[in-house]
Amino acid sequence: MSSAEDGELDPQIQIELENLNSATDEINKLEIELEEANSTFRILLNESTRRLKVSSKKLGNCIEKARPYYEALDKAREAQIECQKAAVKFQRANEIHAAAKETVALAEQRFMSNSHEWQFDNAWQEMLNHATQKVMDAETQKADCHAEHQRLTKLFNAAEQKLQQLEDRFRRSINKSRPYFEEKQVCQDQLQTQKNRIQELQQQVAGAKSTYSTALRNLERISEDIHRQRGDFPTPPGPREPGVGAELNSPTSSALPSLPDFQLELEKCDYPSIAGSQMSLGAKTPQAAAETEDEEDACDYDETGAGELRGVVDERDLEALRQKVKILAVRPIEGGDGQQQNDVWEHELKATVDKLDHLMMLKETAKRQQTNRLKSTEQRPDSLGAEALKRHCDVVEVKVTSCATTASLPVTPHHQLNHLAPPTPIKKLQQQLAPLPSVNVSMRELPLLARLSNELLDRSSAAFGGVRKTLRRRSLE
């Protein structure tokens, strides 16, 4: 091998080596950005699901009541967009039809004005036939577009009517759950934007790897040509395997975990008690039924203290934080060659999300305190005298019942259990609402029972006569 042959190298080798090195750097940079974009997507998904679960737990059954309205709202928007597209198509078809008719009219007018000079030959006949065919096609297209526009208009009107009916029926639930669905829409937009960014990075990585494999194959081809010209080694039999990094199915792309379906994850947040719904209806206790009724009635309360809530948490601060989270979520990662400020960016995003959650928790706490104050005001008795009089009547009733039972009434196991264990508030309420128990008493014992009850009432009234007068005076005042 001479020195002249060593110096005569193909200049394409240097070009392919530069392409190979640049493709390697591009692959490394894009893979780092892709990994960070995936982690950002998962952070956003976790934070979005957590915020939506908190809001869903707070609103309760109002989300279920308002869901048909927002689904109908989406369908109405889609129908409106389709109707607008059909209107544009009909307008274009109408313009094409008018232009075709004008072309035929001008051709006929031009021929009639020069009929003494021109002859109606086959060329004129073919031109008029072609223009007439265009008019007929445009008229058919116009009729089809008009029918399609009418059909979509009817669908849009039906969707609007259904939307109005649902709004009139569930107005309170819709107004109360509006922040939840707006927050859900913001989360969906953020996650969709981040997912589009991930897909774009994946395509860029695939393109960079394709460039890398092309440069590597070119280098292999140049190497084979050089060895064939020199005749140093015989050509190995069989096809040559691809080099490192030139595989068609790259292990790097398959090693990355697939993105979860964020639509499904966000839909799960709408059902906070999905585990409890698996219980049978027959196993539902009265307390659970009462809690369900309270939850259904909770979405119909009147928000009279909206000014106090605005004093605790400003809505403008919440909106500013939401916009900041949205900007941080879709902000591209700056820098290259794997030198990104990942820690600073993640810390800023996490701090903003924590601050937003803190303000939302303050708002939720203020709402709960206001609701508790309203409930306590509704459950408060009219006057102190009425409460004391009711307590005194309960004491007299208990004494009369105990004495009468000791005197003549038979003691059943149910009555004996009630006397041994003090009644709970729920049982006490049931005893007040339930009818009196039926007792088998003979006609001979009725005068004795009447005399005993009259004596007990006289004693109790004599003992608490002064207290009754005072309480009565207070209640009247």
UniProtKB/Swiss-Prot annotation:
Pfam families attached to this UniProt entry: SH3BP5
Comp. bias intervals (Acidic residues): 291-305
Phosphoserine modification, residue list: S113, S115
GO terms classed as biological process: anterior/posterior pattern specification; female germline ring canal formation; intracellular signal transduction; mesoderm development; muscle cell fate specification; muscle organ development; muscle organ morphogenesis
InterPro entries reported for this sequence: SH3BP5
Residue numbers spanned by region Disordered: 224-258, 276-306
The keyword Phosphoprotein is annotated on this UniProt entry: yes
Keyword set includes Transmembrane: no
Protein name: SH3 domain-binding protein 5 homolog
Species per Swiss-Prot/TrEMBL record: Drosophila melanogaster
